[in-house]
């Protein structure tokens, strides 16, 4: 006998769950990367993958169907103008989920969901953050050498 595996309910009523997933999908399409709980990220991935696949058709009917799901003109416009152009040749797998450390307040499993072709280089961002931190930390060797170098240049 066929058993249907239910989707995650996320502790919400049906209408609230649909609204939550619609909002998360809209924000992902606009910002290309969002941080949320792991369960919400996995459910959002299902919705966004179907939306992008539908958008690749490029028809007016597909645009109307996507707007009925998202209810945000900015997100639909971004999807059809920018995202489909960059993802056009990819057959599925448009999103990536990266697991993060648990949230401090309630230890919920956290994750980042992002569009694959829009991922920024995380190494460059972390290097810049380390340099900024070294400048702020008092007594660090980097901060002292920069301070000495800066004073002699004046």
From Swiss-Prot:
An MF annotation (GO) of this entry: structural constituent of ribosome
Origin superkingdom: Bacteria
Pfam short name (any one): Ribosomal_L17
Region (Disordered): 127-154
Biased composition regions of type Basic and acidic residues, renumbered to the chain: 141-154
GO biological process annotation, one example: translation
Keyword vocabulary terms for this entry: Ribonucleoprotein, Ribosomal protein
Gene Ontology annotations for the cellular component aspect, listed alphabetically: cytosolic large ribosomal subunit
Subunit structure: Part of the 50S ribosomal subunit. Contacts protein L32.
Record-stated family: Belongs to the bacterial ribosomal protein bL17 family.
UniProt-recorded name of the protein: Large ribosomal subunit protein bL17
Native species: Chlorobaculum parvum (strain DSM 263 / NCIMB 8327) (Chlorobium vibrioforme subsp. thiosulfatophilum)
